[in-house]
Amino acid sequence: MMTGNIMDYLEWYGDFDFSVLPFNEVDNLILAELSYASLDRIVPEPQLGRKIEGVSVSEAASRLRASGRVERSCKLEQNAGFLLYEMAKGKRFSDAVLGAYVDKHDFENQEQFSALHVYLPDDTIFVSYSGTDDTILGWKEDLNMAYQMPVPSQEEAVEYLEKTIPQDGRKIRIGGHSKGGNLAIYASVMCYDRLKRRITEIYNNDGPGFLESMLEKESYIEIKDRIRTIVPETSIVGMLLEHGDSYEVVKSVSKGIMQHDGLSWQVYKNGFVKLDERSKESLVIDDTLRTWIMGLDDEERVAFVDAVYELLTKAGIRYLSDLEQYKNVMLNNMAKEMFSLEPDKAKMMRRITRALISEYGRNIVKKIRGDKREKDNGI
Protein backbone atom coordinates (compact mmCIF):
# COMPACT_ATOMS: atom_id res chain seq x y z
CA MET A 1 0.00 0.00 0.00
CA MET A 2 1.62 3.24 -1.15
CA THR A 3 1.09 6.01 1.37
CA GLY A 4 2.27 9.60 1.54
CA ASN A 5 1.28 12.95 3.02
CA ILE A 6 -0.73 15.93 1.81
CA MET A 7 2.10 17.00 -0.51
CA ASP A 8 2.03 13.56 -2.16
CA TYR A 9 -1.77 13.77 -2.42
CA LEU A 10 -1.42 17.00 -4.42
CA GLU A 11 1.03 15.23 -6.72
CA TRP A 12 -1.34 12.26 -7.15
CA TYR A 13 -4.64 14.11 -7.46
CA GLY A 14 -3.70 17.73 -8.18
CA ASP A 15 -5.15 17.53 -11.69
CA PHE A 16 -8.46 15.96 -10.62
CA ASP A 17 -11.11 18.66 -10.45
CA PHE A 18 -13.91 18.54 -7.87
CA SER A 19 -16.45 17.16 -10.35
CA VAL A 20 -14.28 14.05 -10.70
CA LEU A 21 -13.00 13.79 -7.11
CA PRO A 22 -15.34 15.54 -4.64
CA PHE A 23 -14.04 17.45 -1.63
CA ASN A 24 -12.66 15.11 1.04
CA GLU A 25 -10.90 15.04 4.42
CA VAL A 26 -7.44 15.43 2.87
CA ASP A 27 -8.52 18.60 1.05
CA ASN A 28 -9.67 19.88 4.44
CA LEU A 29 -6.22 19.46 5.99
CA ILE A 30 -4.55 21.12 3.00
CA LEU A 31 -6.75 24.21 3.36
CA ALA A 32 -6.37 24.22 7.16
CA GLU A 33 -2.57 24.17 6.84
CA LEU A 34 -2.64 26.85 4.14
CA SER A 35 -3.73 29.49 6.67
CA TYR A 36 -0.29 29.29 8.32
CA ALA A 37 1.26 30.91 5.22
CA SER A 38 2.42 34.51 5.45
CA LEU A 39 0.08 36.13 2.93
CA ASP A 40 -0.02 39.75 4.06
CA ARG A 41 -0.16 42.08 1.01
CA ILE A 42 -0.48 38.98 -1.19
CA VAL A 43 -4.09 37.99 -0.44
CA PRO A 44 -6.59 40.88 -0.04
CA GLU A 45 -8.06 41.75 3.35
CA PRO A 46 -11.83 41.56 4.03
CA GLN A 47 -13.73 44.11 1.95
CA LEU A 48 -16.48 46.52 2.98
CA GLY A 49 -19.95 45.27 2.16
CA ARG A 50 -18.73 41.65 2.04
CA LYS A 51 -17.48 42.26 -1.50
CA ILE A 52 -15.46 39.31 -2.77
CA GLU A 53 -11.99 40.40 -3.75
CA GLY A 54 -9.27 37.81 -4.04
CA VAL A 55 -6.45 36.27 -6.01
CA SER A 56 -6.18 32.82 -7.50
CA VAL A 57 -3.99 30.23 -5.81
CA SER A 58 -1.62 30.32 -8.79
CA GLU A 59 -1.30 34.13 -8.59
CA ALA A 60 -0.83 34.04 -4.80
CA ALA A 61 1.91 31.43 -5.22
CA SER A 62 3.69 33.62 -7.80
CA ARG A 63 3.50 36.68 -5.52
CA LEU A 64 4.73 34.73 -2.51
CA ARG A 65 7.66 33.31 -4.45
CA ALA A 66 8.59 36.77 -5.74
CA SER A 67 8.50 38.21 -2.21
CA GLY A 68 11.22 35.82 -0.99
CA ARG A 69 9.58 35.69 2.43
CA VAL A 70 9.18 31.89 2.58
CA GLU A 71 12.92 31.43 2.91
CA ARG A 72 12.99 33.91 5.81
CA SER A 73 10.01 32.40 7.66
CA CYS A 74 9.75 29.94 10.54
CA LYS A 75 9.28 26.28 9.61
CA LEU A 76 5.50 26.41 10.06
CA GLU A 77 5.13 29.27 7.58
CA GLN A 78 7.70 27.74 5.23
CA ASN A 79 5.78 24.47 5.00
CA ALA A 80 2.55 26.37 4.31
CA GLY A 81 4.31 28.37 1.60
CA PHE A 82 5.62 25.21 -0.06
CA LEU A 83 2.10 23.77 0.19
CA LEU A 84 0.74 26.80 -1.69
CA TYR A 85 3.37 26.31 -4.41
CA GLU A 86 2.26 22.68 -4.79
CA MET A 87 -1.44 23.63 -4.89
CA ALA A 88 -0.71 26.04 -7.75
CA LYS A 89 0.66 23.26 -9.98
CA GLY A 90 -2.61 21.40 -10.61
CA LYS A 91 -6.09 22.37 -11.78
CA ARG A 92 -7.75 21.10 -8.57
CA PHE A 93 -6.70 24.20 -6.64
CA SER A 94 -4.85 26.54 -9.04
CA ASP A 95 -7.99 28.51 -9.93
CA ALA A 96 -9.44 28.56 -6.40
CA VAL A 97 -9.64 32.12 -5.09
CA LEU A 98 -8.10 33.27 -1.80
CA GLY A 99 -9.54 36.27 0.02
CA ALA A 100 -10.49 37.95 3.31
CA TYR A 101 -7.01 37.38 4.74
CA VAL A 102 -6.45 38.52 8.32
CA ASP A 103 -3.31 38.19 10.44
CA LYS A 104 -3.40 39.85 13.85
CA HIS A 105 -1.06 39.88 16.86
CA ASP A 106 -2.23 41.86 19.88
CA PHE A 107 0.25 41.53 22.75
CA GLU A 108 -1.78 43.75 25.06
CA ASN A 109 -4.88 41.55 24.81
CA GLN A 110 -2.83 38.36 24.41
CA GLU A 111 -4.41 37.49 21.07
CA GLN A 112 -3.07 35.83 17.93
CA PHE A 113 -5.56 35.39 15.09
CA SER A 114 -5.25 34.55 11.42
CA ALA A 115 -7.79 33.35 8.85
CA LEU A 116 -8.73 33.40 5.17
CA HIS A 117 -11.45 32.33 2.74
CA VAL A 118 -10.93 29.81 -0.05
CA TYR A 119 -13.55 30.07 -2.82
CA LEU A 120 -13.47 26.61 -4.38
CA PRO A 121 -14.38 25.59 -7.96
CA ASP A 122 -17.22 23.39 -6.59
CA ASP A 123 -19.04 26.65 -5.69
CA THR A 124 -18.45 26.32 -1.95
CA ILE A 125 -16.46 28.41 0.52
CA PHE A 126 -13.88 27.02 2.92
CA VAL A 127 -13.15 29.27 5.90
CA SER A 128 -9.70 28.40 7.23
CA TYR A 129 -8.69 29.43 10.74
CA SER A 130 -4.98 29.34 11.48
CA GLY A 131 -3.68 27.53 14.52
CA THR A 132 -1.07 28.78 16.93
CA ASP A 133 1.97 30.24 15.23
CA ASP A 134 5.58 30.37 16.43
CA THR A 135 4.95 33.16 18.96
CA ILE A 136 4.87 32.70 22.73
CA LEU A 137 1.85 35.02 22.60
CA GLY A 138 -0.10 32.47 20.57
CA TRP A 139 0.67 29.66 22.99
CA LYS A 140 -0.27 31.89 25.94
CA GLU A 141 -3.72 32.32 24.47
CA ASP A 142 -4.00 28.54 24.06
CA LEU A 143 -3.15 28.07 27.73
CA ASN A 144 -5.73 30.71 28.68
CA MET A 145 -8.39 28.34 27.31
CA ALA A 146 -7.86 26.17 30.41
CA TYR A 147 -9.80 28.72 32.49
CA GLN A 148 -11.27 31.34 30.15
CA MET A 149 -14.03 31.26 27.54
CA PRO A 150 -14.18 33.05 25.28
CA VAL A 151 -10.56 34.01 24.70
CA PRO A 152 -10.05 36.99 22.33
CA SER A 153 -9.36 34.86 19.24
CA GLN A 154 -12.63 32.95 19.76
CA GLU A 155 -14.58 36.22 19.80
CA GLU A 156 -12.61 37.36 16.76
CA ALA A 157 -13.43 34.10 14.95
CA VAL A 158 -17.19 34.66 15.33
CA GLU A 159 -16.98 38.31 14.24
CA TYR A 160 -14.79 37.38 11.27
CA LEU A 161 -17.21 34.70 10.09
CA GLU A 162 -20.31 36.88 10.46
CA LYS A 163 -18.82 39.99 8.84
CA THR A 164 -16.83 38.51 5.95
CA ILE A 165 -18.96 35.71 4.49
CA PRO A 166 -20.76 36.87 1.32
CA GLN A 167 -24.54 36.60 1.55
CA ASP A 168 -24.91 34.60 -1.64
CA GLY A 169 -26.27 31.34 -0.22
CA ARG A 170 -23.21 29.25 -1.03
CA LYS A 171 -22.55 26.28 1.24
CA ILE A 172 -19.70 26.71 3.70
CA ARG A 173 -17.12 24.38 5.18
CA ILE A 174 -15.10 25.61 8.14
CA GLY A 175 -11.87 24.15 9.46
CA GLY A 176 -8.53 24.65 11.07
CA HIS A 177 -5.52 22.92 12.54
CA SER A 178 -4.59 23.08 16.24
CA LYS A 179 -6.19 26.17 17.80
CA GLY A 180 -7.72 26.82 14.37
CA GLY A 181 -9.87 23.71 14.79
CA ASN A 182 -11.13 25.03 18.11
CA LEU A 183 -11.94 28.39 16.49
CA ALA A 184 -13.77 26.66 13.63
CA ILE A 185 -16.09 24.93 16.10
CA TYR A 186 -16.55 28.00 18.30
CA ALA A 187 -17.43 30.28 15.38
CA SER A 188 -19.88 27.72 14.00
CA VAL A 189 -21.60 27.36 17.37
CA MET A 190 -21.86 31.08 18.11
CA CYS A 191 -22.69 32.60 14.70
CA TYR A 192 -26.22 33.70 13.83
CA ASP A 193 -28.72 31.02 12.77
CA ARG A 194 -29.13 31.96 9.10
CA LEU A 195 -25.38 31.64 8.60
CA LYS A 196 -25.21 28.47 10.67
CA ARG A 197 -27.68 26.77 8.33
CA ARG A 198 -25.25 27.21 5.42
CA ILE A 199 -22.44 25.34 7.21
CA THR A 200 -22.22 21.75 5.98
CA GLU A 201 -19.02 20.51 7.67
CA ILE A 202 -16.73 21.66 10.48
CA TYR A 203 -13.22 20.20 10.63
CA ASN A 204 -11.14 20.18 13.80
CA ASN A 205 -7.66 18.89 12.96
CA ASP A 206 -6.00 18.04 16.30
CA GLY A 207 -7.36 21.15 17.99
CA PRO A 208 -8.04 21.47 21.73
CA GLY A 209 -11.52 21.12 23.19
CA PHE A 210 -13.51 23.43 25.44
CA LEU A 211 -14.59 24.00 28.99
CA GLU A 212 -17.54 21.77 29.94
CA SER A 213 -20.02 24.68 29.78
CA MET A 214 -19.53 24.94 26.00
CA LEU A 215 -20.67 21.37 25.40
CA GLU A 216 -23.92 22.01 27.25
CA LYS A 217 -24.99 24.88 24.97
CA GLU A 218 -28.03 24.18 22.81
CA SER A 219 -26.24 25.84 19.89
CA TYR A 220 -23.35 23.36 20.26
CA ILE A 221 -25.66 20.34 20.40
CA GLU A 222 -27.41 21.67 17.28
CA ILE A 223 -24.28 21.51 15.09
CA LYS A 224 -22.50 18.63 16.84
CA ASP A 225 -23.22 16.12 14.05
CA ARG A 226 -21.47 18.37 11.51
CA ILE A 227 -18.17 18.33 13.44
CA ARG A 228 -15.33 16.02 12.39
CA THR A 229 -12.42 15.85 14.80
CA ILE A 230 -9.32 14.21 13.35
CA VAL A 231 -6.29 13.45 15.54
CA PRO A 232 -2.97 11.60 15.12
CA GLU A 233 -2.35 8.41 17.07
CA THR A 234 -0.29 10.17 19.76
CA SER A 235 -2.49 13.23 20.01
CA ILE A 236 -1.66 15.60 22.85
CA VAL A 237 -2.92 19.05 21.81
CA GLY A 238 -6.12 17.59 20.37
CA MET A 239 -6.99 15.85 23.63
CA LEU A 240 -6.75 18.96 25.81
CA LEU A 241 -9.95 20.03 27.60
CA GLU A 242 -13.37 18.54 26.77
CA HIS A 243 -14.65 17.19 23.45
CA GLY A 244 -18.31 16.45 22.96
CA ASP A 245 -17.80 14.81 19.60
CA SER A 246 -16.17 11.51 18.67
CA TYR A 247 -12.81 11.59 16.90
CA GLU A 248 -11.05 9.77 14.08
CA VAL A 249 -7.46 8.57 14.55
CA VAL A 250 -4.92 8.81 11.73
CA LYS A 251 -1.48 7.28 11.26
CA SER A 252 1.54 9.59 11.59
CA VAL A 253 5.18 8.98 10.67
CA SER A 254 6.43 11.24 13.48
CA LYS A 255 6.84 10.52 17.19
CA GLY A 256 5.21 12.07 20.25
CA ILE A 257 4.25 15.75 20.13
CA MET A 258 5.71 16.05 16.60
CA GLN A 259 2.66 14.15 15.32
CA HIS A 260 0.79 17.43 15.75
CA ASP A 261 2.37 18.44 12.43
CA GLY A 262 -0.28 17.76 9.79
CA LEU A 263 2.40 17.05 7.19
CA SER A 264 3.26 13.89 9.14
CA TRP A 265 -0.25 12.43 8.76
CA GLN A 266 -0.40 9.49 6.37
CA VAL A 267 -2.61 9.59 3.29
CA TYR A 268 -3.75 6.64 1.17
CA LYS A 269 -5.45 7.56 -2.09
CA ASN A 270 -8.01 10.28 -1.20
CA GLY A 271 -8.26 9.63 2.56
CA PHE A 272 -6.18 9.30 5.69
CA VAL A 273 -4.74 6.02 6.93
CA LYS A 274 -7.08 5.35 9.87
CA LEU A 275 -6.35 3.52 13.13
CA ASP A 276 -8.78 1.99 15.62
CA GLU A 277 -7.48 3.87 18.65
CA ARG A 278 -4.90 6.31 19.98
CA SER A 279 -1.50 5.16 21.22
CA LYS A 280 -0.96 4.23 24.86
CA GLU A 281 1.41 7.21 25.16
CA SER A 282 -1.40 9.56 24.14
CA LEU A 283 -3.79 7.96 26.63
CA VAL A 284 -1.27 8.32 29.48
CA ILE A 285 -0.60 12.00 28.69
CA ASP A 286 -4.33 12.65 28.29
CA ASP A 287 -5.14 11.08 31.68
CA THR A 288 -2.27 13.00 33.28
CA LEU A 289 -3.19 16.44 31.95
CA ARG A 290 -6.92 15.93 32.49
CA THR A 291 -6.46 14.91 36.16
CA TRP A 292 -3.84 17.62 36.74
CA ILE A 293 -5.96 20.43 35.23
CA MET A 294 -9.10 19.26 37.06
CA GLY A 295 -7.10 19.35 40.30
CA LEU A 296 -6.45 23.09 39.90
CA ASP A 297 -9.06 25.71 40.64
CA ASP A 298 -9.50 28.67 38.27
CA GLU A 299 -7.31 30.93 40.39
CA GLU A 300 -4.44 28.42 40.32
CA ARG A 301 -4.80 27.92 36.56
CA VAL A 302 -4.63 31.67 35.95
CA ALA A 303 -1.65 32.13 38.28
CA PHE A 304 0.31 29.23 36.78
CA VAL A 305 -0.27 30.24 33.14
CA ASP A 306 0.61 33.89 33.88
CA ALA A 307 3.76 32.87 35.76
CA VAL A 308 5.00 30.66 32.89
CA TYR A 309 4.33 33.46 30.37
CA GLU A 310 6.11 36.00 32.60
CA LEU A 311 9.08 33.67 32.95
CA LEU A 312 9.42 33.21 29.20
CA THR A 313 8.95 36.86 28.22
CA LYS A 314 11.34 38.16 30.88
CA ALA A 315 13.92 35.68 29.61
CA GLY A 316 13.65 37.37 26.21
CA ILE A 317 11.74 34.55 24.52
CA ARG A 318 9.14 35.78 22.01
CA TYR A 319 9.16 32.82 19.64
CA LEU A 320 9.31 29.07 20.22
CA SER A 321 12.12 28.95 17.66
CA ASP A 322 14.16 31.12 20.07
CA LEU A 323 14.25 28.16 22.44
CA GLU A 324 15.60 25.92 19.70
CA GLN A 325 18.02 28.39 18.11
CA TYR A 326 19.45 29.84 21.32
CA LYS A 327 18.66 26.94 23.64
CA ASN A 328 21.54 27.28 26.10
CA VAL A 329 21.30 31.07 26.39
CA MET A 330 17.51 31.00 26.77
CA LEU A 331 17.53 28.21 29.36
CA ASN A 332 20.16 30.12 31.32
CA ASN A 333 17.99 33.27 31.14
CA MET A 334 14.94 31.29 32.31
CA ALA A 335 16.88 29.88 35.26
CA LYS A 336 17.90 33.41 36.29
CA GLU A 337 14.33 34.68 35.98
CA MET A 338 13.03 31.74 38.02
CA PHE A 339 15.13 32.90 40.95
CA SER A 340 13.86 36.47 40.54
CA LEU A 341 10.19 35.49 40.76
CA GLU A 342 8.29 36.62 43.81
CA PRO A 343 8.57 33.93 46.54
CA ASP A 344 4.85 33.12 46.44
CA LYS A 345 4.89 32.70 42.64
CA ALA A 346 8.00 30.52 42.73
CA LYS A 347 6.49 28.34 45.46
CA MET A 348 3.23 27.99 43.53
CA MET A 349 5.06 27.00 40.33
CA ARG A 350 7.11 24.35 42.14
CA ARG A 351 4.00 22.90 43.80
CA ILE A 352 1.93 22.73 40.62
CA THR A 353 4.83 21.35 38.57
CA ARG A 354 5.47 18.66 41.19
CA ALA A 355 1.77 17.70 41.02
CA LEU A 356 2.05 17.32 37.23
CA ILE A 357 5.17 15.14 37.47
CA SER A 358 3.61 13.04 40.22
CA GLU A 359 0.42 12.47 38.21
CA TYR A 360 2.44 11.48 35.15
CA GLY A 361 4.39 8.96 37.26
CA ARG A 362 1.16 7.43 38.58
CA ASN A 363 -0.22 7.01 35.07
CA ILE A 364 3.01 5.43 33.80
CA VAL A 365 2.81 2.86 36.62
CA LYS A 366 -0.86 2.17 35.72
CA LYS A 367 0.14 1.65 32.08
CA ILE A 368 2.98 -0.76 32.99
CA ARG A 369 0.66 -2.77 35.24
CA GLY A 370 -2.00 -2.84 32.53
CA ASP A 371 0.52 -4.03 29.93
CA LYS A 372 1.68 -6.77 32.31
CA ARG A 373 -1.90 -7.95 32.91
CA GLU A 374 -2.51 -8.10 29.16
CA LYS A 375 0.70 -10.08 28.67
CA ASP A 376 -0.15 -12.50 31.50
CA ASN A 377 -3.62 -13.01 30.04
CA GLY A 378 -2.22 -13.57 26.57
CA ILE A 379 -3.95 -10.55 25.08
Report residues per predicted region:
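Alpha/beta hydrolase fold serine-hydrolase catalytic domain that processes acyl esters and thioesters
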Residues: 1-116, 120-125, 129-146, 150-159, ...
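Gly/Ala-rich beta-loop-alpha elbow adjacent to hydrolase catalytic centers
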Residues: 175-180, 184
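Short glycine-enriched nucleophile-adjacent loop
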Residues: 184-193
